[in-house]
Amino acid sequence: TDLLWGLRGGGGNFGVVVSLEFRLHPLTTVLSGLLLYPLDQARTVLHRFNEFIATAPDELTIRSGFLQIPDGQTVLFLSPTYCGSLEMGEQAIAPLRTFGTVLVDQMQSVSYHELIHSNDAFTPKGRHGYLQTQSLEGLQTETIEALIEQGLPLPSPFSAINIHHFHGAASRVGVSETAFALRQDHLMVELIAAWEPQDDEQRYIQWAQNLSQALASYAFKGGYINLLSEQEQERVRLAFGSNYERLLDLKRKYDPDDVFRSTIGHLAPNSLTR
């Protein structure tokens, strides 16, 4: 029982899962796509987005952020996904089109398979990348200003700021029910620095680190566990929060020699955090 608890958020710290049975839920098509807005309307759109998601239904999740389109222009995007009837989905996302001037509207009904693979083109083989994350309770004036004033311009056409919307059923799980500790509605800001192999990586890494630091004082402690590096052990501890000591006990019990150490969210059994 303890091991199963630890696996739900504790990653590969305790072993390798060789067999898994899980329940599927039918989901054939979803309403999804991109809405693009001009950069000079970003503050207004993001404030309205922040107000809107407070009452969003479970069936709707909305990513937001900044990206560069093929003509070199940086734009703000909203990317809703509605898992339900097309008619209800259209009603749910209709207000988003009033938040500002919609430059491009790519909302459409797509298969779930298409949705899962819709970002494949952004991660071609050979491209280098570096990620930082901060989780915010919401967007306030200060965080919006940090995103715009310190995050832009993006350091390359392949880089982006991706704001993930976490809410619904996952927020109704008790903090101690699984190892994953952040069980409340929040926004996870993913800072994606990407560059070609011949470029100077330090410029891109510095961009992500500087923006992450600018957001840190407004963020929950830690970060998104799946995107924390081996060098961010203190953030790993903070991300697991009140579940960290229980996870550490499991690590010491089942893997005291740290055989399973090449893992995201690594727990060192000899940790001196007690």
Where are the language model's segments positioned?
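Soluble FAD-dependent oxygen oxidases
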Residues: 1-274
